[in-house]
From Swiss-Prot:
PROSITE patterns registered for this protein in UniProt: G_TR_1, G_TR_2
UniProt keywords, alphabetically: Cytoplasm, Elongation factor, GTP-binding, Nucleotide-binding, Protein biosynthesis
Residues engaged in binding GTP: 17-24, 81-85, 135-138
Role played: Catalyzes the GTP-dependent ribosomal translocation step during translation elongation. During this step, the ribosome changes from the pre-translocational (PRE) to the post-translocational (POST) state as the newly formed A-site-bound peptidyl-tRNA and P-site-bound deacylated tRNA move to the P and E sites, respectively. Catalyzes the coordinated movement of the two tRNA molecules, the mRNA and conformational changes in the ribosome.
PANTHER family documented for this protein: RIBOSOME-RELEASING FACTOR 2, MITOCHONDRIAL, TRANSLATION ELONGATION FACTOR G-RELATED
Organism this protein belongs to: Mycoplasmopsis synoviae (strain 53)
InterPro entries given in the database record: EFG_II (IPR041095), EFG_III (IPR009022), EFG_III/V (IPR035647), EFG_IV (IPR047872), EFG_V (IPR035649), EFG_V-like (IPR000640), EFTu-like_2 (IPR004161), G_TR_CS (IPR031157)
Pfam families per record: EFG_C, EFG_III, EFG_IV, GTP_EFTU, GTP_EFTU_D2
Family label: Belongs to the TRAFAC class translation factor GTPase superfamily. Classic translation factor GTPase family. EF-G/EF-2 subfamily.
GO MF entries: GTP binding; GTPase activity; translation elongation factor activity
Protein name (database record): Elongation factor G
GO biological process per UniProt: ribosome disassembly
Amino acid sequence: MARDYDLKDYRNIGIMAHIDAGKTTTTERILYHTGKIHKIGETHDGVSQMDWMEQEKERGITITSAATTAYWKNKRINIIDTPGHVDFTVEVERSLRVLDGAVAVLDAQSGVEPQTETVWRQATNYKVPRIVYVNKMDKAGADFEAAVASVKSRLGGNAVAIQWPIGSESNFNGIIDLVTMTATTYNGESAEEEFPMEIPTDLLDVAKAKRQELLEAAANFDEEVMMMVLEGADVDIDTFKNTIRKATLTSEFFPVVCGTSFKNKGVKKMIDAVVDYLPSPLDIPPIKAYLNDQETDVVATDDGEFAALAFKVMTDPFVGSLTFFRVYRGVLEKGSYVYNSTKEQKERIGRILQMHANNRVEIDECRAGDIAAAVGLKFTTTGDTLVGEKSPKVVLEKMVFPEPVISQALEPESKAANEKLSLGLQKLSAEDPTFRTYTDEETGQTIISGMGELHLDIIVDRLKREFGVKVKVGAPQVSYRETITKSAEVEGKHIKQSGGKGQYGHVWLKFEPNHDQGFEFIDKIVGGKIPKEYIKPIQKGLEEKMAVGILAGYPMIDVKATLFDGSYHDVDSSELAYKIAASKALTKAKDLIGTVLLEPIMDVSVVVPSDHMGDVIGDLSRRRGLISDQEQRNDGAVIVRAKVPLSEMFGYSTELRSMTSGRGTYQMQFDHYEKCPKNISDEIIKKRNIQNKDEE
């Protein structure tokens, strides 16, 4: 079957923003104008097309990235709507991994906000070209120029206006296109229709000056056009557009457009900018992959061997497990087999679906550039590579996700619900790489871990709604870690030889701090002092002991262990004996290697009216917070940024509401681990040890 659209006519884009900047409404309007939906849904009414989970409809925020396909001016646009709440940063991360371009939505009054910085940084990591859409131009305090300036000052982004607003706040009623030097006005409150108009005389000089700024900024990326500008020659509109496109594709130049999505003003022009300036799959560099540990490139084409990346797994109430994937190369037909080169497993592709939020259309095949979903894959999880059954087993560059920082104990309200709870947790953890679940061996409790309180609230809610399991929830617990601060050489022995088959394991290990490098095991055994078959069990013994810690029962991180000596017994040595010997060595080393407790430190941004700033700063300081920055916003609010231990932030939203009469908001996300102050560390260790004794 031939392609409906050439690869050069594809646009795989994401809509990204701070919570409440209007990105779901913006996506709704794109779908409305491109003919995908016939009735507009409003987020505040709980009927948005893209927010299809019950929790999203109730809370008016986007939790999971819904995918949809739309068409505009002979281009196919695959859109992923991403969450703006930091607890769901993983959704943004995995979406950006498979997108070619993005629209960053800003609030015209607030400009760049805390979560904007986070998603912008993620997009920069993946080198995703962006256009900036300044939304809510009709809002009180809207300031287009200040919003553009905030991208430069706060994000370090080379943002340049390609449009200029006619009026602002309640007087916003038109847009000047700086490329074509034409103007458009709108009909009434909800602007279904656009009308051409002359550029208002009071804005003509401003528009000319801004057009020249735009031309000079874009010309920096095209020597030929730069020469034309320097010589004062005319640059025709097609050349001008091509120059802006070329600049945008470098990810170092960001065209800025404006509008108000809620009232339909500027949305069509924003879609035009997506089509004109964001990349097709052919415009981005080839994707990095590995074949037999050698780096190779995967070039976008239908003709090559099939290669795709699974970027999301979710449970659909009607079809079961859905795996979303982006095709980078080749063609996939329904009914065929693929090979999961990450898991080394064969999978059958029974059905292929194209998604529109939670509606689905069955398709026969998908090709390079497509984003689709497969039904019922058994082994594939987020970040896995899928290749043709008989293709070279390339593995695409992996996706990296942050570790969970907060935990809660769960208990089903009835024992009969245990099985349903287990099934629900298994499915939810398959969907979300930042959600973990395990059973505490000492207490028998089911523990869930995630990125924040809202993240875990949603999990508990989904257990109830989707799996019919009501649970009692314990108080949130901080995910502490243990690490070492000194080096030491330690002997570990596990020797039992008293008749019959004995046990003999004997090792010498050197432990060293391994800051930010995780666990590293080095084998320096020479001369066969320990046979090769026992080296892996020694490493395994250390890993198992590190998982439960040696100080207070928390996982250990950032340790280098070098095996440099030991001995063995011809008859009595075994894998188990060496595992135990290694574990004993680490336990014995506890005091010698300066084991300490680490606590998660959060990056906190609080937005408050300036008259409450002193109270907020004082309160954060009492919570052991270090104030890193304060910034005055145009609307009279202040952003206070601080690094605060997670343990001090429980219940902060209630406290902030009370302190600011409900006018303050905050965002927080994990930043790093830091050594606990001794008095707090001692208290935690004491409490954990008492707990453990009570349970013995």
